[in-house]
Amino acid sequence: MNFLAHLHCSPNHELIRVFNFTGDGFRGTSWKAEAMPEKIMGVELHRFIDSFTDEHPTSKKAKAVLREGAGKTAPIALDLFGDYFLHKYWNRMKGLQSFTSDVPIDAFVQNCFSQIHDADHLLQGKASRMWPFMRSENWLMDYEHLSGIKRAATGMSRRHPAIKPLGVFFNGLSEGDYNYLAAEQWFLSFYPELVKASTKFVEDHPLAKSISWL
C-alpha cells in the first residue's frame, strides 16, 4: 500500500505512525538491537501491511488484471490506486478506525503531516527523500483526484526509467474504464480486511504492553 493507507492503518500513536510511514528505510533486523518498542512495532507493521497486501488473493487477482496494461509495474499501480480510492471512499472507510470516525480526510492528513514534521529526523530511506516534496506539494491530498495519481506516476516514471510503463498506464486511464473498475472493486473488498488485520497485528504484537498508549 502507499503512504496514505499506511498512515490510516497505523494506530493513533505518533511514533508508531511515523515509523510505519518510513518503514521501507529499514532493512534486515540489525536496527532492532537498541530500538525503542514504538520503532519496532511501526517498522514491523509497515512490513505486515505490505506482505498482507501482496499475498492477499484479491490483490493477486487485481494485479493480474492491471498487468495487461501496466506490466511489471502493476503492484505500484495498485498502491497508487489504494490512496486514490481511500480518498474517494473516505466517508465509508473512516469509521474503520475509531480515531478517524468523525474526521474529514484533510484534517487527518494535516494531523499526520504535523506528526511527521515533528519527527522528521527519524525518517529513513524513500520516505526521508520524498518527505520535503510530499509536504511542500501536499501529495497526499493531491491523490484525491485521478489527475493527482497521474502526476505521481509520471514523476516516478521520469525519475526511474525502468518503470516508464507506469506513467504510460495512468496517462491512458479514464475513470470508469476496465482497469479503473477492477482496482475499485479490489479496494472496496480488500481495504476493510487490511485495516482489521493491521489492528489485530498491533493488538497481538509482543511489545504492545511495553508502549504507552496515552
Where on the chain are the PLM-derived regions?
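N-terminal leader/auxiliary helical segments
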Residues: 1-214
